[in-house]
């Protein structure tokens, strides 16, 4: 929520009081959304930054590649969220110089994410034969690798 407070200009307390926080996993989040009254239809992507922070810890996610166990767990969580109804995976890829920063003023996790890790995450969509990759920014050559690895469309 602190990252959202900084970038979306919605106060932390407002989010805390105005939204249910009765979930931990993406499937639980989707169940919570289902229970919550809404005025509009909605669909979700699985954001890679929170998954990486959940599995690796914030400092590790911002400072190194995933190890094999972490990569496998993130891929498992992506598959789990897709099975629960997620549209695909999403990431901000604006680089270290992005002005859209994390709550502590440093780049977002996915701005620093290793390209090869991202490609491995995209392969989950190929395995499932469905889903989209949503990327804010990013290098065209990397985005092309993602589409090739996933066999899926990209929203860029």
For the regions a language model picked out, list residue spans one by one.
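Divalent-metal coordination cores built from histidine and acidic residues
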Residues: 1-89
């Amino acid at each position: 929520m602190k990252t959202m407070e900084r970038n979306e200009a919605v106060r932390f307390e407002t989010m805390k009081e105005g939204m249910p926080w009765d979930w931990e996993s993406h499937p639980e989040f989707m169940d919570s959304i289902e229970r919550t009254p809404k005025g509009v239809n909605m669909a979700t992507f699985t954001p890679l930054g929170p998954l990486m922070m959940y599995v690796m810890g914030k400092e590790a996610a911002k400072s190194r590649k995933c190890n094999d166990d972490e990569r496998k767990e993130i891929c498992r969580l992506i598959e789990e969220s897709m099975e629960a109804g997620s549209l695909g995976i999403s990431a901000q890829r604006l680089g270290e110089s992005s002005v859209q920063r994390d709550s502590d003023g440093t780049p977002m996790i996915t701005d620093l994410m290793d390209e090869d890790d991202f490609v491995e995450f995209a392969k989950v969509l190929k395995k499932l034969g469905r889903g989209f990759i949503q990327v804010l920014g990013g290098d065209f050559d990397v985005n092309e690798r993602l589409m090739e690895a996933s066999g899926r469309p990209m929203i860029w």
